[in-house]
Amino acid sequence: MKRLLCVLLAGLMAMSLFACGKKAAPEQSGDPVAQSSITALQYSDDNVLVRFTRVDDTWKWADGLDFPLDDTFVLQLEKEVGALLQAESIGMIEDAATYGFDNAQKYIAVTNQDKTVRLSFGKQNAEGKWYMTRDDQPDAAYLADDQLVQKLSTSIYDMALLPTLPAFTQENLCTVTLDQEEGLHLHLTAKDGEWTASGKKVKADDLQKELENLTVTKCVDYHPTAGAISLCGFDTPLSVTVSYANSVGSMSDWVLKIGGEAIDGEGFYVTVGEDSTIYEMPKDHLTSVLQLAADNRQELSVDDAELEENN
């Protein structure tokens, strides 16, 4: 009996010594920042920094509260971060460099009224997940999905609500006027599916179709600076004024200003109506307008040359 007791005691002592030799991950005892209490959220991938604040239970861009934000992305990110805050640790951090925490550039920070928790992301493991640490539990390591971490490269302009353009049809189109400071002025009148200028028929077969399908594909710059306006080609923009009968039957003028070619090569920079925001419009939505402008400028330059020769 004594011998059996000794064996049991020895086993218990060995288990105790083994346990003492390992660090245990901290237990989760309720998260200090619950999803329902988040009042601010920001993220960065070291190239972009985007900050949001909750105003009257609605998410706003912290650096422009009047920005036309589609908060679908923010709500999804908030949900994913809320789940991540409840994740269990995978163990204690023995060496920060092993996990990439010594130079972590990607992070999400969430705030309630009293506390901010920052989640920093280090390296990816063999399965493609990212090691994560929390500043309120700096000794513990966690794992985060790659899908979430990739979202940290999302620009605020990717979340912009794009403007709804007027619905132009053959029935409501009246006139289209092209103006540019370089001596361009072309006034087109629509009648029975044809276009005329100064009483003469103008070849513009696809103009109506293009006007019916106008759309902007992305927001490029909100409240642009003078430098950005110039860089995007709006020093001497091509102005397109469309007069049409609106939904209540009265006449309205809608103005589209076309700047330079977009850096991605897929469209042109434009502004819509009185809004100074710069958007991008696909090239194939502007083919007829740009061709009419080019042809008219060419005719003007020929006339000018002939006038100079006669003088």
Q: What are these regions, as identified by a protein language model?
A:
Residues S16-A19:
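C-terminal motif of bacterial Sec signal peptides marking the signal peptidase cleavage site
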Residues M1-G11:
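Positively charged n-region of N-terminal signal peptides that target proteins for export
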Residues G21-N311:
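A short-motif feature that recognizes glycine-rich, charge-decorated loops
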